[in-house]
């Protein structure tokens, strides 16, 4: 399960799909991953509590973590499938590499069965459908580690409004009862 104490430990012990691009990047990026792996693992207190999913509101990942469950639900609805959540597993041959996808289609009746799902809930850029290099590397590593052939790159953008009035002023929406 993602964002648990075990998940943080497993990720710290490996080069994971989400940070592998740093190994191929600039000297600064390479130094950053070396530093990340040399310092002690940081496990948020909330991750140690079994029933308290952790979302750090002080990071850019907050927006993505906050809306990931909604993105999964919408994906399941749109594609009439079921997505399962899995933890970080090591590569079967190279144990220093690991990956934890956002989900895998687990409905054996679905044409998407066995396909991974990588979600990016963006906030400050346009949805293009073309993954940034670091996302492409991430998905390639995920497929390699999990020995799967396909992954859906799923970008969503959820806009927050301070008031109901702001919501209605942002288009010609109709209220449902």
Question: Where are the predicted features?
Answer:
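Charged, glycine-rich intrinsically disordered N-terminal tails and low-complexity linkers that flank
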Residues: 1-70, 160-162, 175-176
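Nucleic-acid nuclease catalytic cores
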Residues: 61, 77-101, 105-177
């Amino acid at each position: 399960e993602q964002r648990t104490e075990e998940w943080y430990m497993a990720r710290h012990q490996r080069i994971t799909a989400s940070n592998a691009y740093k190994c191929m990047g600039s000297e600064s990026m390479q130094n950053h991953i070396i530093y990340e792996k040399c310092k002690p693992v940081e496990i948020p207190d909330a991750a140690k509590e079994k029933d308290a999913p952790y979302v750090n509101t002080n990071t850019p990942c907050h927006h993505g973590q906050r809306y990931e469950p909604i993105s999964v639900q919408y994906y399941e609805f749109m594609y009439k499938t079921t997505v399962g959540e899995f933890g970080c597993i090591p590569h079967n041959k190279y144990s220093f590499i690991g990956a934890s996808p956002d989900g895998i289609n687990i409905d054996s009746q679905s044409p998407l069965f066995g396909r991974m799902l990588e979600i990016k809930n963006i906030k400050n850029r346009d949805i293009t459908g073309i993954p940034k290099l670091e996302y492409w590397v991430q998905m390639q590593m995920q497929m390699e580690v999990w020995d799967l052939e396909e992954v859906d790159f799923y970008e969503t953008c959820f806009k927050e409004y301070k008031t109901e009035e702001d919501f209605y002023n942002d288009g010609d929406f109709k209220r449902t009862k």
